[in-house]
């Protein structure tokens, strides 16, 4: 996955009772990448979430070193992080998503 911002929809939660200490207090989400119209691209991933996104919500993600910085720790084994819950997407002058 490239190190840029991505759109995704939250498809579920991951529960891990035993995990790396750098991930101890954050929720893990299953996400599916989408394009600007909300069409899934078939790529699913696990993202760390410290802002409270829920199933069905559109989220903004960062990956790589940007994800570690967003997660507040360069030492955490984080590669994908939720950095925003999307309220609206406008593409080509049309509202394609509104919460």
UniProtKB/Swiss-Prot annotation:
Location(s) in or outside the cell: Bacterial microcompartment
GO cellular component: bacterial microcompartment
Induction field: Part of the 17-gene eut operon transcribed from a single promoter, induced by ethanolamine and adenosylcobalamin (AdoCbl, vitamin B12).
UniProt pathway annotation: Amine and polyamine degradation; ethanolamine degradation
Record keywords: Bacterial microcompartment, Virulence
Lineage top rank: taxon: Bacteria
Main location: other
Null allele phenotype: A double eutM-eutN strain grows as well as wild-type on ethanolamine (EA) and cyanocobalamin, but a quadruple eutL-eutK-eutM-eutN strain does not grow. A non-polar deletion mutant grows on EA at pH 5.5 to pH 7.0 but not at pH 8.0 or pH 8.5, releases increased amounts of acetaldehyde on EA plus vitamin B12. Preventing acetaldehyde vapor loss allow growth up to pH 8.5.
Amino-acid biosynthesis in keyword set: no
SUPFAM superfamilies for the chain: EutN/CcmL-like (SSF159133)
Biological processes, Gene Ontology terms: ethanolamine catabolic process; generation of precursor metabolites and energy
Residue ranges annotated for the BMV domain, each copy included: 5-87
InterPro entries per record: EutN_CcmL, EutN_CcmL_sf
Record has Nucleotide-binding as a keyword: no
Biotechnological applications: Artificial BMCs can be made in E.coli by expressing eutK, eutL, eutM, eutN, eutS (eutSMNLK) or eutS alone. Cargo proteins can be targeted to them and beta-galactosidase (lacZ) was active within the BMC, showing the BMC allows passage of substrate into the interior. This can lead to the development of tailored BMCs for specific metabolic reactions. The addition of eutQ to the eutSMNLK construct results in biogenesis of multiple BMCs.
Family listed: Belongs to the CcmL/EutN family.
Additional detail: The need for a bacterial microcompartment in EA metabolism can be bypassed by increasing the levels of EAL and an acetaldehyde dehydrogenase (not necessarily EutE).
Quaternary structure note: Homopentamer with a small central pore.
Role description: Probably forms vertices in the bacterial microcompartment (BMC) shell dedicated to ethanolamine degradation. Expression of eutK, eutL, eutM, eutN, eutS (eutSMNLK) in E.coli leads to formation of a single BMC. Coexpression of eutQ with eutSMNLK permits E.coli to make cells with more than one mobile BMC, as is usual in vivo. It may be involved in transporting positively charged molecules into and out of the BMC. The ethanolamine (EA) catabolic bacterial microcompartment (BMC) probably concentrates low levels of ethanolamine catabolic enzymes, concentrates volatile reaction intermediates, keeps the level of toxic acetaldehyde low, generates enough acetyl-CoA to support cell growth, and maintains a pool of free coenzyme A (CoA) and NAD.
UniProt-recorded name of the protein: Bacterial microcompartment shell vertex protein EutN
Classification of source organism: Bacteria, Pseudomonadati, Pseudomonadota, Gammaproteobacteria, Enterobacterales
